[in-house]
Amino acid sequence: MEDFQLLPLEKGNTPEFKREMQKAFQCGYKAEYGPCREIILPERDIDQSLHAPDASAYAAWVNGRIEGGAVLKIGPAARHNHLELLFVRAGTQSRGLGHAIWKRIEQLYPETETWETFTPYFEKRNLHFYVNCCGFHIVEFFNPRHPLPEMDEDGRVGGMDREAGQYFFRFLKTMRSERRQEESALILKWSAAQCRKHRTELEKDAEAKK
């Protein structure tokens, strides 16, 4: 991607970062339920993630402008980490930036064994993104019979209405198994190359003996 950088969020860029994140979440909700007067992702919720212990925030810069970003919660041993929030500027989705952000995050924390994140059930774009693009697996489904722990006293999450806010998915991605798959692929590739090399040498020997 042209001139893409994922850099630690600086204090001076935080207001724009939060504004664009709110717009992105608002557009996702609007696409499913129509216009909403409530702020789907209130600023207090963003601040709670930004100021949480072990929080790390990154802004995605493309051609000198913030086009997305993420907020992470990194565990003490960096083994089980949380993707708290991830967004791409409204109107620029489906161009590969979200995937670029995520792959860069994986590179920044190579010792991570598992990543965890959540998303509401109505966000079909997110479901596709996390499962099909990033390799997460759905491991839990929150609903009225199995409520989300972070739900407000009135049964809501953020500015979403009760129906939308009661249904969430929890995702996990196990990095160790993915690394094993990558290592196995490299071994197979190396073995195939060695077989080709050996076959070429045998053919040369056969030609020399003629």
How would you describe each model-predicted region?
Residues 43-59, 68, 164:
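A short helix-loop-beta-strand connector motif used in the catalytic cores of GNAT acetyltransferases and
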Residues 118-122, 132-162:
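Conserved catalytic-core motifs of GNAT/GCN5-like acyltransferases
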Residues 25-46:
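Conserved GNAT-fold acetyl-CoA-binding loop/helix
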